[in-house]
Amino acid sequence: MSTFAFLLFCAQACLIQNVCGLYLGGLGGCGCGGGWNGWNGLGGGWNGLGVGWNGIDGGYGAGCGSYGGEGIGNVGVAGELPVGGVTAVGGRVPIIGGVEYGGPACAAGAVSICGHCAPTCGCGRAGLGGYY
């Protein structure tokens, strides 16, 4: 097999993985119930929808703008990822799959993550606007 044919085969495999991988495992990692003894439940407590710390348009003035994005890939961080000062991300932050933290995730100040998931994330709670 020539080098060009091998590279063409690899490019086609990547394209097929990109197209078919969008719909595989869409419910992986998105639970339908509240986790952490109800802290992430649907209505009250920490990160609830409407009441509690960092609820949607709730405590500390943390409002939620629109979110949308998609992507496939792996991001690996080995070691430290220090961030000093203010870090703002404007635009899209595409995440498909699971997000896992091994060890402590320390933060000083206010940290809020708001967004809108696709219909499969959070089991498509249409009555709540799909917020997860």
Swiss-Prot record:
Pfam family, one: Chorion_1
Stretch list, region Central domain: 66-113
GO MF entries: structural constituent of egg chorion
Gene Ontology terms: biological process: chorion-containing eggshell formation
Signal peptide: 1-21
Region (Right arm) location: 114-132
Region of interest (Left arm), ranges: 22-65
Sorted UniProt keywords: Repeat, Signal
Cellular component GO terms held in the UniProt record: egg chorion
InterPro entries per record: Chorion
Protein family (similarity comment): Belongs to the chorion protein family.
Function as written in the Swiss-Prot or TrEMBL entry: This protein is one of many from the eggshell of the silk moth.
Protein name: Chorion class A protein L12
Biological source species: Bombyx mori (Silk moth)
